[in-house]
Amino acid sequence: MTTTPGTLYIISAPSGAGKTSLVKALLQTGIDLSLSISYTSRQPRPEEMDGRDYHFVTRQVFEQKLQEDEFLESAELYGNFYGTSKKWINETMTSGRDILLEIDSQGARQVRAVFPVAVGIFVLPPSLEVLEMRLRQRAQDSLEAISRRLAAAREELSHAGEYNYIIINDKLDRALQDLKCIIQAERLKTAKQLVRHHGLLAQLTRTSVL
């Protein structure tokens, strides 16, 4: 079997849609896929760990990396910077591993400009009321922050049509199954299978069964 370049999956959602929980559930299944860890200039939340959730750096370090063109995409959100390592993405895809990239729609457009065949997946909440409830349940966010996130959510939701797939995250187990099905379907596409199994196909087409 021949190794093919990895597939880049972009997953986006408004804050509170449950994207992070969905991605964590996917990784816990043991799926053969690498999660891209973004760089950020914001402070870590109590439960977050450097190198696992984000690469936490100072604003000065982030701006230096930005000037040195180290990011495939970058964006400012709620006064903090976020960016994806260009070198890591290229090396991982070249090795044949699939990558899951958690970014917003602004970053997704930047990535698709470089990787137009990237597979876009957008996660929707079942309703705006559920989205607001999820945001209010976050103890670390102030009322002002929740209001900002709700306003940003409406803007983010307007870009759902730019993606290849849409998942409704009402029940986590159902959303997880949908996400796994998308990845499996992409891996079985003819273009990739022809490269992976060209030896088998060549053997089958030249060997007589009689």
Swiss-Prot record:
Q: Which reaction is the catalytic activity of this chain?
A: GMP + ATP = GDP + ADP
Write out the annotated subcellular location. Answer: Cytoplasm
Q: Which UniProt keywords apply?
A: ATP-binding, Cytoplasm, Kinase, Nucleotide-binding, Transferase
Tell me the superkingdom of the source: Bacteria
List residues of the Guanylate kinase-like domain: 6-184
Protein family per UniProt: Belongs to the guanylate kinase family.
Name under which the protein is recorded: Guanylate kinase
| Organism whose genome encodes this protein | Nitrosospira multiformis (strain ATCC 25196 / NCIMB 11849 / C 71)
Organism lineage reads as: Bacteria, Pseudomonadati, Pseudomonadota, Betaproteobacteria, Nitrosomonadales
